[in-house]
């Protein structure tokens, strides 16, 4: 397992469009995912312990952000041939098990991850309603183990600020996780 941190936030970088299949049987574009106050794009996978430690918090935060007009989407860009736990079938099972309220998309060509410069799982990208990047940080202090329940909710607080002001926080702690499994 190669451990990486996400890159710094390149404020105001415009989101790149995509058209990816979801576990719900639909294809999703950037515009279809955008909420009235913003969008959270999450590069995740099924097998990484850093993702597993925050899965339930991702689900919680996505539900709460939805109430603020901020939609969420998860994208899996790993090589599913060499990492069968990340297969489309297993993506669907995980989404059903955890009751994902957001689309879970497969980036089989890995082009979307490359366009976004995603490097690890989880890697979070918070956009304002104008499709401008405002957050590229961690969910919270969790690593391979889930952080205490009363830990600061970095991602949620940043996305709430983006929804209210159209701007993200200047100070951001990078996300940390397994490298994306490139083909």
Describe the residue ranges of each PLM region.
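Chalcogenol-based redox active-site neighborhoods
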Residues: 1-163, 168-171, 179
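Amphipathic alpha-helical surface "interface" segments used
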Residues: 175-183
């Amino acid at each position: 397992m190669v451990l990486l941190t996400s890159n710094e936030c390149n404020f105001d970088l415009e989101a790149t469009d995509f058209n990816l299949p979801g576990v719900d049987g639909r294809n999703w574009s950037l515009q279809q995912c955008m909420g009235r106050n913003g969008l959270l794009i999450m590069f995740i996978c099924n097998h990484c312990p850093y993702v597993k430690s925050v899965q339930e918090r991702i689900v919680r935060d996505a539900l709460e952000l939805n109430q603020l007009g901020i939609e969420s989407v998860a994208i899996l860009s790993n090589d599913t041939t060499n990492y069968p736990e990340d297969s489309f079938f297993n993506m669907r099972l995980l989404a059903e098990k955890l009751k994902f309220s957001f689309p879970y998309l497969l980036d089989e060509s890995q082009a979307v991850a490359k366009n976004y410069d995603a490097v690890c799982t989880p890697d979070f990208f918070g956009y304002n309603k104008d499709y401008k990047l405002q957050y590229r940080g961690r969910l919270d202090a969790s690593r391979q183990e889930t952080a205490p329940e009363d830990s600061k909710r970095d991602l949620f607080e940043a996305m709430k600020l983006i929804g209210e002001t159209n701007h993200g926080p200047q100070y951001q702690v990078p996300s940390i996780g397994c490298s994306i499994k490139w083909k």
